[in-house]
Amino acid sequence: MPKIKKKGQAGAAKNYITRTQAVKKLQLSLPDFRKLCIWKGIYPREPRNKKKVSKSATASTTFYYTKDIQYLLHEPLLQKFRDQKVLEKKISRALGRGDVSDAARFERHAARPEATGKPRYTLNHVIRERYPTFNDALRDLDDCLSMLFLFANLPSTSAVPAKMIARCERLCLEFQHYLIVSHSLRKSFLSIKGIYYQANIQGEDILWLVPYKFNQRIVGDVDFRIMGTFVEFYMTLLGFVNYRLYSSIGLKYPPKFDQLKDENGAELGAFSLEGVNMATQGETKAVTNGEEQQQGPDPKVQAEVDKIIKQLKEDESKSDETAEEDAEADDEEKPTDSIDKFEPVAPGGDVLPQPAYSSSDPSQLFANFTFYLSRETPRQPLEFILRAFGCKRIGWDSVLGEGAFTNDESDPSITHHIIDRPVVQAATNEDGDGEDNQTAQKVGPNQRYPGRIYVQPQWVWDCVNDEELKSPELYAPGAALPPHLSPFVKAAPGQYDPTLPLEAQQTEAEAIEADLEDAEKGNAEDGSDVENDMDVDEAEDDEEEEEGDEEDAEEAEEEDAEEDEEESKTLQRQLELEAELQGKKVQNTKVDSKTKAKLEQRKALEKKAREEAEDLERAKGMLSKKKRKLFEQMQYTNNKKSAQDEKLRAKRRKLEKEKAQKA
């Protein structure tokens, strides 16, 4: 007889452990257990059957893998938490006994970061364990940057100390400096939540969100203890990443930081970057110069060096002669700068995207310009984006902080002026003659400096996303800005694409309906009656009969006119019925040949759609029940998407018509 297994010794009951059991096993408090799980990347699991897993009568809600908790038993941070817990117990017992001297002694020997400056524990080994390679750390950098940029803009409270905010801000500015030097920034988008940025670092696309520089309110329903635990981990991670990135481009980390400039609002200007070998090069130069002054070169060594240099020159002359001969032989096969075109091998094959050649570097888009930022513009994101795309000279008003190229708005070297204020009518003199904007010495409302381009801030973002300089006239102060589209969303084939013209993506049925609506509106504006049109037609027919010579031709013309009249009457009845069904006013209008053709096309399309629907229903009848349900779900989703796209196209068509009427 086989041995009967005890309940809870194998299977799911052994693979899972409740949170209460895990806390008891690790001998930790619940807040420390949460911290440890967040830092080590251990998350709750959902078993298939909670009744089989739960060993108690009460239903447990949080479960972990037993192997994960077993893995935490060997964590060095566990001993740090235990030591801190023991120390707190000793201090509380001493105070309970009234022994203040012992409590003070325990306090002095404790590791206090605020007093000693040394951290109570470090997370360096956790970073190395969770991210074995640098690319793994880059893939997990999205949430890290979003969280740190968020905390860098928060006000200091008891839950969010000022030191944490300052460190977050410093790490973020160091990361931005790397993006500026390496030109790794690719795209940016202004949204309601904040500003999205996308950078490409060593082949990895990193997307993060930066909130706007507004005063943030701290609400009580947010648990900043949990968020602070994540921030503590992310600060260590970004410190590692910044060090690796700076080292990869030969910069010293951390960069020099000027506290006084930072207090005056310099931000990016408070840092000064240095190369790794700058200090050592200076020392070696000084040493070699001193040696050269004390000792001269050895004459024997100098003679051997001269001999070797002479032989090298002879070899170079021979190689030049052979190179000229090879160049003459290869003149017939000169390489061209043209780019190869990828053409499909067979008809109906895949069409590959063609390579694009651009002589201009997108990373140096603003390199030749000098910008001036008005006081109402967001200085921090504009400065970062302009510097990341090659601009070296950015000025702003002294109210916005230090670090500007110039604080003089009338500097003649300024080429672009970014302004975001409404257009104000310029005041006129008593004589009625307004002051010339180009010759004004003092800039007043709605006055401009000559030879300077004035644009709104959106111009910078659209130029960056399209990798080309947009027309400044579209972004002039007071002008209606073009739509700011997200560069991260690419329209799928068949979906509505706002960048394409409406005619290129609307269906044939939509185009016919739009033409018929235009024709109805035009006829309603004309107000012509069918009876008057009939009289005119009959008069024309009479004239033709008088001019006609042959009776057969006259009879044929009469028959054609009668057929046209019958067709026009039937179409007129159809339009009247449609107007009555839609609740519109019935008008007697003449149906011209174009409208007839459109109506016939619409009839043909409706007939074709009915036939396709019937064929589809017959095909669905051949499917199994399971496949039929799946197909109906797919069909419902596609119809819903097409209806949304149709609404967007109709809205755009209406806006374009209104715009054309105003123009």
From Swiss-Prot:
Where is this gene product found?
Nucleus, Nucleolus; Nucleus, Nucleoplasm
Q: Please give the chief subcellular localization of this protein.
A: nucleus
Concerning InterPro entries, the annotation shows: BRCT_dom, BRCT_dom_sf, PES
Instruction: Cite the BRCT domain residue spans from the record.
Output: 361-477
**What keywords tag this UniProt record?**
Coiled coil, Nucleus, Ribosome biogenesis, rRNA processing
Q: Which residue stretches does the UniProt record annotate as biased composition, category Basic and acidic residues?
A: 311-321, 591-620
- The record's disulfide annotation reads none
Source superkingdom: Eukaryota
Where are the compositionally biased (Acidic residues) regions? 322-334, 526-567
Q: Name one GO biological process term.
A: maturation of LSU-rRNA from tricistronic rRNA transcript (SSU-rRNA, 5.8S rRNA, LSU-rRNA)
* Region annotation Disordered: where it falls in the sequence: 311-360, 428-447, 504-663
Q: Which GO terms describe its cellular component?
A: nucleoplasm; PeBoW complex; preribosome, large subunit precursor
Coiled coil regions, renumbered to chain:
501-663
Record bears the keyword Nucleus:
yes
The yes or no answer to whether the keyword Oxidoreductase is present is no
PANTHER family from the xrefs? PESCADILLO - RELATED (PTHR12221), PESCADILLO HOMOLOG (PTHR12221:SF6)
Provide the function of this protein.
Component of the NOP7 complex, which is required for maturation of the 25S and 5.8S ribosomal RNAs and formation of the 60S ribosome.
Q: Tell me, how does this one assemble? A: Component of the NOP7 complex, composed of erb1, nop7 and ytm1. The complex is held together by erb1, which interacts with nop7 via its N-terminal domain and with ytm1 via a high-affinity interaction between the seven-bladed beta-propeller domains of the 2 proteins. The NOP7 complex associates with the 66S pre-ribosome.
In its UniProt entry, what is this protein called?
Answer: Pescadillo homolog
Q: What gene is it encoded by?
A: nop7
